[in-house]
Amino acid sequence: GGVPCLCDSDGPSVRGNTLSGIIWLAGCPSGWHNCKAHGPTIGWCCKQ
């Protein structure tokens, strides 16, 4: 498992929205894509 994060497609805020991304510290692994244009502060918010 990983730490969930808010993708741009999930909505504007974490409140009441599903967090469909996972934070990866070293960039998105193969087969995943960055799903958040700005942030998170540490790592990348990636989605399969």
Curated annotation (Swiss-Prot):
GO BP annotations listed: regulation of signal transduction
Disulphide bond pairs: 5-45, 7-35, 28-46
Signal peptide: none
Subcellular location as annotated: Secreted; Nematocyst
GO molecular function terms listed in the Swiss-Prot or TrEMBL record: sodium channel regulator activity; toxin activity
Xref: Pfam families: Toxin_4
Protein name: Delta-actitoxin-Afv1b
Annotated organism of origin: Anthopleura fuscoviridis (Sea anemone)
Organism phylogeny: Eukaryota, Metazoa, Cnidaria, Anthozoa, Hexacorallia
